[in-house]
């Protein structure tokens, strides 16, 4: 009986170690069918204008008042992520890893991502 109890306890501990933490989702979440690109790509590849992309990086700066925007950095650059057009906000998450799915928008000199969904992990 003692061996059965120990085996049961080991199985429970193993199940906890394999489940991992789930991501916090905001907006529509991440669309797994949309390609993952680097931040530098949204600046250098003009064909991405108006297209949906997914980015992954760290939240380097964030709106202090309402959480309606942030900058995402991935080692290749930093891009402005705008949450306001889709009507959602993010609680303080500066320094956290994030994935963003959104539309690449650019004007003459600026590039931004209109976020449709964000996951923090």
Predicted regions and their residues:
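Bacterial N-terminal signal peptides
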Residues: 8-17
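OB-fold and OB-like single-stranded nucleic-acid-recognition modules
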Residues: 20-121
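Positively charged n-region of N-terminal signal peptides that target proteins for export
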Residues: 1-4
């Amino acid at each position: 009986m003692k061996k059965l109890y120990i085996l049961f306890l080991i199985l429970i501990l193993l199940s906890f170690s394999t489940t991992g933490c789930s991501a916090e989702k905001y907006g529509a979440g991440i669309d797994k069918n949309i390609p993952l690109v680097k931040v530098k790509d949204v600046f250098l590849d003009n064909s991405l204008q108006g297209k949906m992309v997914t980015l992954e990086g760290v939240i380097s700066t964030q709106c202090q008042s309402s959480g309606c925007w942030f900058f995402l950095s991935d080692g290749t650059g930093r891009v402005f992520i705008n949450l306001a057009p889709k009507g959602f906000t993010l609680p303080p998450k500066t320094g956290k890893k994030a994935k963003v799915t959104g539309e690449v928008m650019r004007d003459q000199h600026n590039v931004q991502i209109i976020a449709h969904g964000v996951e923090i992990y």
